[in-house]
Amino acid sequence: MAREKIVVAGGSTKSWKLLLGLRVFAFMATLAAAIVMSLNKETKTLVVATIGTLPIKATLTAKFQDTPAFVFFVIANVMVSFHNLLMIVLQIFSRKLEYKGVRLLSIAILDMLNATLVSAAANAAVFVAELGKNGNKHAKWNKVCDRFATYCDHGAGALIAAFAGVILMLLVSSVSISRLLINSKHLSTTATTTAVV
């Protein structure tokens, strides 16, 4: 008995499993980045001035909401996580459905848009993290990470997860585009075969 190759949802079962696995990992990476950054907060009491020998202390809090780039980072990672979760659910529950060109095209476009979105958010957050770590002597912005080390470490962890999400979303986009190309070749050969018959 010869084994038949099962074609599922615009590609082979191998590409279906690969895409599902990549989406699951991209979902976990972007969700982890969003959660770590959204819970990133550190409060410290610091000496802000000295009058004579009397130190004046203030309690300062570093949190992600203070920086618009970090807020964008959290929102973008949540949006990409939601997109991946939705695509995972659709991929699992509509496995038997035949994907036509428009549906595959819209999925590929959404994947590319989400890869761009998470990349932009991660790069904006890296820019602000660099300012927090090293400051800017020309603008007279002091560094923050020497005082809020835990805050900066958590932010670095979120950035690592986000860049893993960027790489995974680029791979998801590549697989989505290849499935679209395979489907269009399959449709064109089917149309040619029917036209000849």
Swiss-Prot record:
It is a multi-pass membrane protein. Keywords: Acetylation, Cell membrane, Membrane, Transmembrane, Transmembrane helix. It comes from the Eukaryota. InterPro entries: CASP/CASPL, CASP_dom, CASPL. It is found in: Cell membrane. The modification N-acetylalanine is found at residue 2. Residues 2-17, 91-106, 178-197 are cytoplasmic. The chain crosses the membrane at residues 18-38, 70-90, 107-127, 157-177. Residues 39-69, 128-156 are extracellular. One of its GO terms (cellular component) is plasma membrane. Belongs to the Casparian strip membrane proteins (CASP) family. This is CASP-like protein 1B2. It comes from Arabidopsis lyrata subsp. lyrata.
